[in-house]
C-alpha cells in the first residue's frame, strides 16, 4: 500500500510539472503547411497547399529539385536540393491564461527569416549561429492566429558565407532550408542553465607562458577539426544524445578539444561537452578576407560573435573563440573585434583566426594563443617556422618535414614555437601555439561505405571513384588499396602527433582529421569515416597510445639500425594528466620473434615533457634483417582501463657493405641496351632500373596531402611542383623478393630510401590481370596502375624492372638490404615471371603514352 501511495504521488507530481510546462510553452513541432517560393511571389497569408514536418528541412522532407544521378565528385549529392525562399505556415492557439503575459517565438536554428502573424510582418532575423527569438506579445493575443515563417537560404547573409562557412557549405552540412531543433512559443525567454559539476578540464582554465593550464595543472590540447559532417541529415544534430555519441567517440580516441571550423555548434553540443570535459572553440561563420570596408560583412560577423558569446558563453566547455578560418585582410579590424568580444566575455581566450594569413604574419598583439601551421614566413626549402609535419607541395617544399627528412623520432617544432611572440616584444611574451589542421594524410576510400548513406545525402562521388577504378581494371584491389593506404596513414598520423608531443613549448594540435571530410574534392583523410565509424585501421586503444594525457615517447635518430651499431635512443614522457608519475616504473621491452631485451626506468614527478632515461641495446646477435617492436609501458597507471603504453616498429640489418659479388651474377642496367638485350636472348636475367620518363610519377613517401585535385590546381596556379599524388605501396610480404627485407603489405619507415629514389611507372597498358610485385597506389582522380617493381619473361630471358635507383638507396642500411634482397631474388630459382611479353611489346609499354582522364580544376578560398 505504501509503495502504491508513493507511486501515485510521483505520478501526480510528474503530471503537475508537465502541465506547468505546457502552460508556459507551446511545442510547434509537427505538420506545417508549406510552399516553395522560387519567384518570390507568395504573400503572407496566401494558402499553402503542401505540407512539411518540422523540425526538419526541405531535404529531409524531399522537397525541391530532384537529382536522380550525378557525376559530382566535389562533395556528396543532395537528391533533393533547394535554394531560395520557402514558406512554413500553421495555426496556433494562444490559451486564455496567457493573457497579459509576454509571448516569444523560439526557433533554435534556421536561416534568415521573416515572421508573419495573421498576414502582418512582425519580425525578421538573420541569426544563423544561435536561436532566433521574437517577442510576439502584441500580435499573439489569446485565441487563434495564423503563424507564417518565410525562410530564405539564398539571401539574407553576406555573399561570402555561401561558399566558405561550414554553416552554409555544400561540402558538409549543406545549405539547407528549414527549421531544426526546438520550435516553440513560450511565455518567457529561455534561461541559460549552467553545468552542475565543473569538469577538471575547465577549472581555472588559463595561460601561463606558452601553455594552457586547468585545475592548477599543465594540459595539452589534443584536438580535432569539426566541419559539421552529419551525412544522414545534411544538417547539424540538435539533440544532446547525438552529441554525447559524437563526443563520446572523440573522447574514446583521446580527444579533449574541438575546433569548429567557421561555424558554431548548438546548445546540445556544449551540454555534452560540459559532461565529457572537452574544450570547445567555436568560430565566427566565416572564411575569407576580413574587409574593414565591407560594412555589411563586418556588422554581420560582429553581431554573430556577440550572439555566440551571450548564448553559449555560460557553458564551462566554451573556453576559446576564433574569428574564423584562414582569414586575411585587416589585422587592425581583427584586433578591434577581439577587444569588443573580451568586454562581453572576459573569461574566454581569443585568437584572430585559425591559421590567419596561413601563419605568415606571425603573432600579433591581442592574441591569447596562436593556431597555425607556421610561425611567420620561411625561405622555400626551410622548415624552421613549421608547426605541423605535412603540407601540400604548394605550401611547403617537398610537402613538409615528414616526407622530406630521413625518418626519425627526434623531429619537433621547437624552432617554430620559439618565434611565437608579438612583434616588438620579447621571448618572455611568447603565446601558446596550437598546430593547425595537423596531418591530412589521405586514405583510399572504402566503397562498402556507400550503403551507409540512407539519408538526405548520397555518395555519387564514391560511385564515380569506384567506376573509375573498375574502368582501370583494379576494382578487385579496392579493399587492399584502402587497407594499405590506411595503415600507412595511421603511422603518419602517429608521427605528426608525436612531433607535437616532443615539442616542449607546443600547446596542442587540431587534427584534420579523425573523421573523413566528404567535400572539397572528397578528402578521405580520416581514421574514421564520415559517420565517425571505424575504418578497421586501428582500435581506440591503439590510437590512444599516442593520443592520451600521458604518452611515453621514443626519441631516436632513426627507425632502422645496424647490428654493428646497436640501438641508442632516449625515452621521453609527455605528462599532461594532472597526476604525478613520481616513483612509477616505465617498463620497456624490445621483441622480435621473442624477447630481445628489457629494462625499467623510474619516473620523476615532472609535468609536461621530460626525458626519462637512455636506451643502449646490443643488436650484434642479429645476422639477418629483422623487424622488431619496442614497447614502452608505465605501470600502475590507468586510462580507459589500461596502462599508458606506446609501441614502435623498428628494424635491424647486418652491416653489409659489398654487394659486388651478387651484382656480378646478373646484368644490372639503367637502359635496355644491346648488352641487356643480348643477355635476355641468351636466357639470362636482367635487372633494369630505368631513368624517369613522362610515363612516371615521382616518389612520394607519405600518402598524398588532403586532396590531389585541389592542390594540383593550386600548385599549377602558383607555378609550384605538383605532388606525385600517390598513397603508398601495396605488396605481398610473403613474396620471395622480401626474404631479406621484412615488410608489411603497406609502406613503413624502412621504405624511405627506396621510395624517395623512385619514379613509379604507369602500367595502364598492361593486361587487366597484370599486377606489379610492388604496386604504388594512385589517387582517386588518376587511377593509374603504378609499378615500383615488376617482372616479365621475355623470350628465354627474365627481366626484373625496378623503378628506383637502388644504388642511391644503398647509402642507408635498409636501402642496401633491399638492394641485396632484390639481387638475391633475381639470382634464385624463385625468380620465375609468369607474364610473357615480347621485347617489342615491352619497349612499347615503356614508351607508349597512356590515356589520361581530365582532372577538373578545384580552387581553395585561402590565398596561397
What do these predicted regions represent?
Residues 16-72, 146, 150-159, 178-185, ...:
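Accessory carbohydrate-binding/adhesion or oligomerization-edge regions at the termini
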Residues 23, 195-250, 650:
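N-terminal carbohydrate-binding accessory modules
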Residues 28, 34-39, 78, 83-190, ...:
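Accessory beta-strand-rich segments of carbohydrate-active enzymes
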Residues 103, 115-117, 196-198, 565-604, ...:
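Beta-strand-rich binding/interaction modules
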Residues 257-527:
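Substrate-binding/catalytic cleft of secreted carbohydrate-active enzymes
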Residues 344, 512-577, 850-853:
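Aromatic-rich peripheral "rim/lid" segments of glycoside hydrolase catalytic domains that contact
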Residues 403-419, 695, 712-813, 830-864:
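Catalytic beta-strand/loop cores that center a nucleophilic Ser/Cys/Thr
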Residues 664-709, 796-798, 802, 822:
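Short alpha-beta junction capping motif
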Amino acid at each position: 500500500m505504501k509503495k502504491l501511495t508513493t507511486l501515485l504521488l510521483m505520478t501526480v507530481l510528474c503530471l503537475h510539472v508537465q502541465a506547468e510546462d505546457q502552460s508556459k510553452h507551446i511545442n510547434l513541432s509537427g505538420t506545417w503547411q508549406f510552399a516553395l517560393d522560387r519567384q518570390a511571389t507568395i504573400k503572407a497569408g496566401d494558402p499553402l497547399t503542401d505540407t512539411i514536418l518540422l523540425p526538419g528541412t526541405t531535404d529531409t522532407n524531399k522537397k525541391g529539385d530532384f537529382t536522380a544521378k550525378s557525376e559530382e565528385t566535389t562533395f556528396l549529392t543532395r537528391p533533393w536540393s533547394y535554394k531560395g525562399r520557402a514558406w512554413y505556415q500553421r495555426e496556433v492557439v494562444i490559451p486564455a491564461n496567457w493573457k497579459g503575459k509576454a509571448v516569444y517565438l523560439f526557433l533554435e536554428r534556421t536561416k534568415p527569416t521573416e515572421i508573419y502573424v495573421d498576414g502582418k510582418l512582425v519580425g525578421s532575423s538573420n541569426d544563423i549561429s544561435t536561436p532566433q527569438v521574437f517577442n510576439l506579445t502584441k500580435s499573439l493575443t489569446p485565441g487563434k492566429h495564423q503563424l507564417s515563417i518565410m525562410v530564405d537560404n539564398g539571401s539574407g547573409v553576406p555573399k561570402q558565407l555561401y561558399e566558405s562557412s561550414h554553416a552554409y557549405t555544400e561540402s558538409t552540412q549543406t545549405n539547407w532550408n528549414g527549421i531544426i531543433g526546438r520550435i516553440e512559443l513560450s511565455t518567457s525567454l529561455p534561461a541559460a542553465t549552467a553545468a552542475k559539476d565543473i569538469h577538471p578540464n575547465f577549472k581555472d582554465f588559463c595561460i601561463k607562458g606558452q601553455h594552457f593550464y586547468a585545475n592548477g595543472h599543465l594540459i595539452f590540447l589534443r584536438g580535432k577539426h569539426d566541419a559539421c559532417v552529419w551525412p544522414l541529415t545534411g544538417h547539424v544534430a540538435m539533440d544532446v544524445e547525438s552529441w554525447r555519441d559524437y563526443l563520446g567517440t572523440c573522447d574514446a580516441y583521446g580527444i579533449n578539444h574541438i575546433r569548429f571550423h567557421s561555424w558554431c555548434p548548438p546548445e546540445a553540443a556544449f551540454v555534452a561537452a560540459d559532461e565529457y570535459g572537452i574544450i570547445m572553440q567555436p568560430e565566427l561563420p566565416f572564411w575569407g578576407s576580413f574587409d574593414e570596408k565591407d560594412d555589411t560583412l563586418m556588422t554581420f560577423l560582429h553581431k554573430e560573435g556577440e550572439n555566440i558569446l551571450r548564448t553559449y558563453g555560460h557553458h564551462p566547455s566554451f573556453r576559446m573563440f576564433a574569428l574564423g578560418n584562414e582569414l586575411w585582410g585587416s589585422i587592425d579590424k581583427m584586433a578591434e573585434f577581439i577587444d569588443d568580444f573580451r568586454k562581453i566575455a572576459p573569461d574566454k581566450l581569443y585568437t584572430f583566426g585559425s591559421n590567419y594569413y596561413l601563419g605568415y604574419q606571425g603573432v600579433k598583439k591581442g592574441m591569447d594563443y596562436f593556431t597555425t601551421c607556421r610561425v611567420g614566413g620561411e625561405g622555400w626549402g626551410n622548415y624552421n617556422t613549421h608547426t605541423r609535419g605535412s603540407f601540400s607541395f604548394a605550401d611547403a617544399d617537398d610537402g613538409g618535414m615528414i616526407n622530406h627528412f630521413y625518418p626519425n623520432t627526434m623531429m619537433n617544432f621547437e624552432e617554430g614555437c620559439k618565434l611565437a611572440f608579438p612583434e616588438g616584444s620579447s621571448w618572455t611574451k611568447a603565446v601558446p601555439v596550437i598546430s593547425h589542421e595537423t596531418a591530412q594524410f589521405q586514405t583510399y576510400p572504402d566503397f562498402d561505405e556507400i550503403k551507409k548513406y540512407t539519408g538526405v545525402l548520397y555518395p555519387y562521388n564514391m560511385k564515380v571513384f569506384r567506376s573509375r577504378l573498375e574502368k582501370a581494371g583494379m576494382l578487385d584491389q579496392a579493399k587492399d588499396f584502402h587497407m594499405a593506404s590506411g595503415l600507412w596513414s595511421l603511422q603518419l598520423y602517429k608521427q605528426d602527433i608525436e612531433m607535437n608531443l616532443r615539442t616542449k613549448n607546443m600547446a596542442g594540435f587540431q587534427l584534420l582529421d579523425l573523421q573523413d571530410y566528404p567535400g572539397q574534392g572528397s578528402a578521405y583523410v580520416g581514421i574514421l569515416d564520415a559517420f565517425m565509424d571505424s575504418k578497421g585501421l586501428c582500435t581506440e586503444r591503439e590510437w590512444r597510445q599516442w593520443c592520451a594525457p600521458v604518452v611515453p615517447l621514443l626519441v631516436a635518430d632513426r627507425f632502422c639500425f645496424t647490428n654493428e651499431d646497436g640501438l641508442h635512443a632516449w625515452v621521453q614522457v609527455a605528462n599532461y594528466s594532472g597526476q604525478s608519475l613520481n616513483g612509477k616504473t616505465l617498463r620497456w621491452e624490445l621483441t622480435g620473434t621473442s624477447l630481445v631485451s628489457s629494462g625499467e626506468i623510474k619516473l620523476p614527478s615532472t609535468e609536461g615533457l621530460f626525458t626519462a632515461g637512455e636506451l643502449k641495446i646490443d643488436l650484434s646477435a642479429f645476422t639477418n634483417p629483422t623487424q622488431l617492436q619496442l614497447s614502452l609501458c608505465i605501470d600502475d597507471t590507468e586510462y580507459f582501463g589500461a596502462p599508458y603504453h606506446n609501441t614502435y616498429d623498428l628494424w635491424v640489418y647486418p652491416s653489409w657493405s659489398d654487394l659486388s659479388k651478387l651484382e656480378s651474377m646478373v646484368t644490372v642496367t639503367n637502359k635496355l641496351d644491346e648488352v641487356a638485350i643480348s643477355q635476355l636472348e641468351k636466357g639470362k636475367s636482367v635487372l633494369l632500373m630505368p631513368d624517369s620518363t613522362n610515363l612516371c610519377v615521382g616518389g612520394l613517401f607519405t600518402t598524398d596531402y588532403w586532396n590531389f585535385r585541389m592542390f594540383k590546381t593550386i600548385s599549377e596556379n602558383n607555378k609550384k611542383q605538383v605532388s606525385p599524388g600517390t598513397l603508398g605501396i601495396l605488396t605481398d610480404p610473403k613474396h620471395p623478393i622480401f626474404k631479406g627485407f621484412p615488410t608489411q603489405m603497406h609502406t613503413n619507415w624502412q621504405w624511405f630510401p627506396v621510395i624517395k629514389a623512385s619514379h613509379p611507372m604507369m602500367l595502364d597498358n598492361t593486361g587487366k590481370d597484370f599486377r606489379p610485385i610492388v604496386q604504388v597506389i594512385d589517387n582517386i582522380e588518376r587511377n593509374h596502375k603504378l609499378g615500383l617493381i615488376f617482372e616479365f619473361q621475355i623470350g628465354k630471358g627474365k627481366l626484373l624492372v625496378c623503378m628506383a635507383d637502388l644504388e642511391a638507396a644503398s647509402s642507408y642500411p635498409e636501402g642496401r638490404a633491399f638492394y641485396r634482397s632484390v639481387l638475391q631474388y633475381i639470382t634464385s630459382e624463385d625468380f620465375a615471371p609468369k607474364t610473357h611479353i615480347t621485347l617489342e611489346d615491352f619497349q612499347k609499354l615503356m614508351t607508349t603514352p597512356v590515356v589520361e582522364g581530365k582532372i577538373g580544376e578545384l580552387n581553395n578560398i585561402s590565398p596561397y
